[in-house]
Swiss-Prot record:
Keywords carried by this UniProt record: Calcium, Cytoplasmic vesicle, Disulfide bond, Glycoprotein, Hydrolase, Magnesium, Membrane, Metal-binding, Transmembrane, Transmembrane helix
Stated role: Catalyzes the hydrolysis of nucleoside triphosphates and diphosphates in a calcium- or magnesium-dependent manner. Preferentially hydrolyzes nucleoside 5'-triphosphates, with substrate preference for UTP > GTP > CTP. Hydrolyzes ATP and nucleoside diphosphates only to a minor extent.
Lineage: Eukaryota, Metazoa, Chordata, Craniata, Vertebrata
Family according to the record: Belongs to the GDA1/CD39 NTPase family.
Record protein name field: Ectonucleoside triphosphate diphosphohydrolase 7
Cofactor: Ca(2+); Mg(2+)
Cytoplasmic side: 1-28, 568-604
Amino acid sequence: MARISFSYLCPASWYFTVPTVSPFLRQRVAFLGLFFISCLLLLMLIIDFRHWSASLPRDRQYERYLARVGELEATDTEDPNLNYGLVVDCGSSGSRIFVYFWPRHNGNPHDLLDIKQMRDRNSQPVVKKIKPGISAMADTPEHASDYLRPLLSFAAAHVPVKKHKETPLYILCTAGMRLLPERKQLAILADLVKDLPLEFDFLFSQSQAEVISGKQEGVYAWIGINFVLGRFDHEDESDAEATQELAAGRRRTVGILDMGGASLQIAYEVPTSTSVLPAKQEEAAKILLAEFNLGCDVQHTEHVYRVYVTTFLGFGGNFARQRYEDLVLNETLNKNRLLGQKTGLSPDNPFLDPCLPVGLTDVVERNSQVLHVRGRGDWVSCGAMLSPLLARSNTSQASLNGIYQSPIDFNNSEFYGFSEFFYCTEDVLRIGGRYHGPTFAKAAQDYCGMAWSVLTQRFKNGLFSSHADEHRLKYQCFKSAWMYQVLHEGFHFPYDYPNLRTAQLVYDREVQWTLGAILYKTRFLPLRDLRQEGVRQAHGSWFRLSFVYNHYLFFACILVVLLAIFLYLLRLRRIHHRQTRASAPLDLLWLEEVVPMMGVQVGP
């Protein structure tokens, strides 16, 4: 039986074909896609990293600004994470107690505690002063604890009761106690150690009540100033002026100059390596240098500092005036005896004092001797007369009174001048702040040359600072000349030295040496927090590091995925080539077949 087959022919427009994609074209597309995605990811990574690194200084600067603003607000005593500390400054004229607080340590062993002075509900510093000084208890040491009771009761009322047992108390005695015999010093301290723990629950032991030296007091003052200025924060480089470094990762600290009424003090950091000195100077340098570590771990040396600190008794502004008057009195009376003159013996024939304003009259009395003086306002001559009072030696490495002074790198240093350095430049001259020697000399010379009547009239008209009084007007000429001589002739500061600032406040607050004392005394406390939060610190370190390194991890993962896609496409390409070669004979066979027309019979 014959077989009949039919073939149905459709219009040509009904047929369609799918073009075969060239393997070469597909490979090019894959490579272009891979290159484009890689470039895009790299660009995003660069932009994000630049944004992150650029935002860090701004964030740190903003955080420091918020911290300074927060220091002026009332302390939140309800915060359980706050710790407290007390420092009693037992001075010569009175005693003061300062209350400090700080949050938990941030867990970084390279950072110091963030200690601030406590403020009450009215945002006022928590501090109290009593008079007289504790040295008044020299003959009745058994009443020393009674003497300090008002201060400690005041502090106990401000520190939360549940924090009393963990609040350290430090009683540090200064000049007044130093003048007492050691036997009386020990008797006063023994009474404090015995009686105070019976009444107050503060953390207090025998080692926390002591008489500190002038050197220690100067070191504490240096620590406090540099801490407030942020010079111990080595990772913060937002302040371009403050980031000049002494070594890698180490910010430049500032030196301090402080001239009071009776004494003068200087303190500044010196390099750890110094030149070889003669034997006598080497011994003097060891006495005047203090090396200490503010860090909580002795293994970390980024907070090791070597500071030169010296206190000069008798070189303060008021005491220097007394020494000057003694000098003038003795020289004038001796000259009168030798030459038969009567200078200064009566108001009609006064001694013409170059260190007083023009026309100002005064009387110098020593025992039964009297010297009448009248100002002639010669600032340059005044400085020349003050030069012998500096008691300098001929050696180049000696300052006032022939005392050794460590070299100062005036090209890479910065100093702050307090007390008389600020009063002399600001109270009447109104040029406080950044000090410029020639400008100060010109202003001081002009002031000294004015008549006393003109100065008093200007004072009545309110042209001087609100802190100025008649005593300041009277002795401004002398004190400005004395300050100038001490700075440039005594300490050898260049006349055009640009990095001295005179100040009364730092960031709108007075900085006491007690802040530096509690920073030093509590330097090991962060170890407690570090041990308690060891596990959390490890996790915190991972999250901090992942902020940066997750970008690289993500980028690496994308590259792995793209590589897998590329290998997969390459695999498909090879499979396609095999299938193409296998189907080639079938295609030839198919082309040899004949497609019969519809209705045509094919034989058997």
